[in-house]
Amino acid sequence: MLGDLFTKPKKRKYATIPSDGTKADVPEGIMTKCPECKKIMYTKELQKNLMVCNYCGFHHPIGAKARIDMLVDEGSFEEIDANLTTANPLGFEDYMDRIEKDKQKSGLNEAILTGHATIGGNPLVIAVMDSRFRMASMGSVVGEKILRAVEDADKTNKPFVIFTASGGARMQEGMLSLMQMAKTSAAFKRFSNHGGLVITVMTHPTTGGVSASFASLGDYNFAEPGALIGFAGRRVIEQTVREELPEDFQTAEFLLKHGQLDDCISRLDLQNKLSFILSIHVKTPEVGGEADGE
């Protein structure tokens, strides 16, 4: 009995049974797991639902081209300023290598896609930011493309609609990126002074210099449900004000509740909503005066 206490236990032997190869081979990308409710669904079904979760309504991120395809009238989109590409004015190390990788990943030359289109037959100039490209940070080219798009809307007498999704100003361009905040805001103001209509739709995430400049300067300011919208990060604010912030702080729903948004609109309803707003703001030619030769 006592001897058993000092006896080494015998090691259990295990045998590895080879797989018979009958395990189902699931192609990559065929299923998508919702990060919010953790439910798994077919990717094709998710795409049919405009990348909105069928179970909880979570809005999955989408690229600029996909958003335009699901929003504007088929075949109506005509891109503008596609030739504008980023330089490296500060000589930031490996910046251009990162830009090239993002070009391949997103299929875009920059973090924003701009052009003319129609929604429900209503003409507009549209701009869509793409978070796959440098987290849609605003550098000199992004600012320039927004400026030119707004000026195009002004010249052609069309409304301007912009979808924002950004991590803020692009640090690799330093002061040049910060200048875009004033540049874009001034363009919005000039357009507004000329009677132009601006609609902003903030998507997840809209933060930093973009949220602090043009993102909230629309005549209508909308957001997708659950979008993170704010300037500084939650922890930075808590450490500054020395207070615990509400759980839903910096969400689209929180901003709507406190009067900083006009509406929080599901992606599934956005096309109809925009079509209606654009239709009631159509500018008609003035009757009489010089137009009639008087």
UniProtKB/Swiss-Prot annotation:
Cited function: Component of the acetyl coenzyme A carboxylase (ACC) complex. Biotin carboxylase (BC) catalyzes the carboxylation of biotin on its carrier protein (BCCP) and then the CO(2) group is transferred by the transcarboxylase to acetyl-CoA to form malonyl-CoA.
Residue span, CoA carboxyltransferase N-terminal domain: 30-294
GO molecular function terms noted in the UniProt entry: acetyl-CoA carboxylase activity; ATP binding; carboxyl- or carbamoyltransferase activity; zinc ion binding
Top-level division of the source organism's lineage: Bacteria
InterPro entries, alphabetized: AcCoA_carboxyl_beta, Acetyl_CoA_COase_Trfase_b_su, ClpP/crotonase-like_dom_sf, COA_CT_N, Znf-ACC
EC nos: 2.1.3.15
Zinc finger (C4-type): 34-56
A single cellular component GO annotation: acetyl-CoA carboxylase complex
Positions with a binding annotation for Zn(2+): 34, 37, 53, 56
Example of a GO biological process term: malonyl-CoA biosynthetic process
Subcellular location: Cytoplasm
Cofactor(s) demanded: Zn(2+)
Pfam families per record: Carboxyl_trans, Zn_ribbon_ACC
HAMAP family associated with the record: AcetylCoA_CT_beta (MF_01395)
Pathway membership: Lipid metabolism; malonyl-CoA biosynthesis; malonyl-CoA from acetyl-CoA: step 1/1
Cofactor notes: Binds 1 zinc ion per subunit.
Keywords of the record: ATP-binding, Cytoplasm, Fatty acid biosynthesis, Fatty acid metabolism, Lipid biosynthesis, Lipid metabolism, Metal-binding, Nucleotide-binding, Transferase, Zinc, Zinc-finger
Source organism per UniProt: Listeria monocytogenes serotype 4a (strain HCC23)
Oligomer status and interactors: Acetyl-CoA carboxylase is a heterohexamer composed of biotin carboxyl carrier protein (AccB), biotin carboxylase (AccC) and two subunits each of ACCase subunit alpha (AccA) and ACCase subunit beta (AccD).
Gene label: accD
Name this polypeptide is given: Acetyl-coenzyme A carboxylase carboxyl transferase subunit beta
Keyword Nucleotide-binding: yes
